[in-house]
Amino acid sequence: MYHQIFHVGNIIFYILLAVCGVLLIQKIIYHIFGLFPSKRFPDAKKDHKYAIIIPARNESKVIAGLLDSIKNQNYNKDLLKTFVVVEQESDPTCEICKNYENVEVFVRKHLENKGKGYALDEVIKHIFASNEKYEAFFICDADNVLDKNFIMEMNKCFDMGYKLCLGYRNSKNWNGGWVASCSALTFSMINTFQNKSKARFNRNVVVSGTGFYIASDILEELGGWDFCTLTEDYEISTYSTLHNIKSTYNEYAEYYDEQPTSLKTSWNQRLRWCKGYSQVNKKYNKKLIKSVIFDREKRLNKFEYVFSILPVMGLIATTILYTLFTFVLAIVGSFIGSAYAWPVWRAFITVVGAMYLFFVLYSMVMLIAERKHTNITMKNSLICCLMSPFYWASYVPIYVTAMFKRTVEWKPIIHKVQMSDDGKTSVEATLEEGVEKK
């Protein structure tokens, strides 16, 4: 009986594994094409006018780095205006902004609405009311630093008619510890194995964090910034897919931000992402599925956006369930003295070892693919690869925990790295990050 249970469990596992493998062919193709160089966008025929919006509550220790990088852009400065959003006039950020041209400080009035999305909505409505005309809005976090060609590269995409475009998200602190390097590696995966390939196949890309622009006519139609879930970036991506908004990704428009260095900070950050992901799916998935069925325009793009995650989730769930199945069965077998207990233990060790080895090799491939962008040392590369399976495995309890989190409070999180104009880093900075509360 014991052996039969193990045998049936194996059969079910291999069948589900095969099904998930077939359904993952599209993802595998994307990964392969992600290893090839990105396409270069042609030079723009016109320099367009942009507003750069920076939510910057209590960000006086980092805001200068971003404003300096904006000042040093290889772009017509008369076509750029920066809006820094604060909550109080006494914020030291306001004094720093006075040292820069074409920078306006906007003080929020409706502080009862907490969150980045509401801050963006206030300032954008203020801009619309002032009758200042901009063709698109760039969204940046205060701790970001832009490569000198960032806006020039993004302008190429806008000039080609893309209403939404994101740049290449790089990290300031690849060598800031295993948590920071694993976090940075996650964005490398999104950059290279997802958005690069999506752009190549003219699929809608997924915005991650900041470093993107959105055309002003979209926000004018909405009457402001209408994306106020916990993950406004993912919400924008979903909205653009639903409404057939043309989006792309430009690898050569590079910007930098800092990754968390402690597991606790990273946990809280990813907790917000997981909960926000659920919020957006709840808000948009029914509309997307309905659009897939009844709207012929970009039907395949929408179908892929909604359902492409299912094989991945299925593979993860199948592997976790089989691991738990063999672990429990092995313990029971050892307790009752079954002769088949060792084969079950061997199956458990094999599947856990295979998962670990897969993620180690996957991380190695990503680091090799991203070697031109990273400054990570060989030692830290090795540590990153060895620890990445634990980092990604932690998403499972994080996602489960997110289901029981209800309210959000914004708390300061210490950052330690600020980039100078020569690309070097120094230990200073703070940023705000959303932390879930039970």
Predicted features by range, described:
Residues 64, 91-99, 107, 116, ...:
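Acidic helix N-cap motif at the loop->helix transition within catalytic regions
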Residues 109, 113-130, 149-230, 267, ...:
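Long helical/loop segments within the catalytic core of UDP-sugar-dependent glycosyltransferases
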Residues 68-79:
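Short, acidic, metal-binding catalytic loop of nucleotide-sugar glycosyltransferases
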Residues 92, 140-157:
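Acidic donor-binding/catalytic loop of UDP-sugar-dependent glycosyltransferases
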Residues 86-94, 110-112, 145:
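A conserved acidic beta->alpha catalytic loop
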Residues 31-48, 287-302, 329-438:
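Juxtamembrane C-terminal module of membrane proteins
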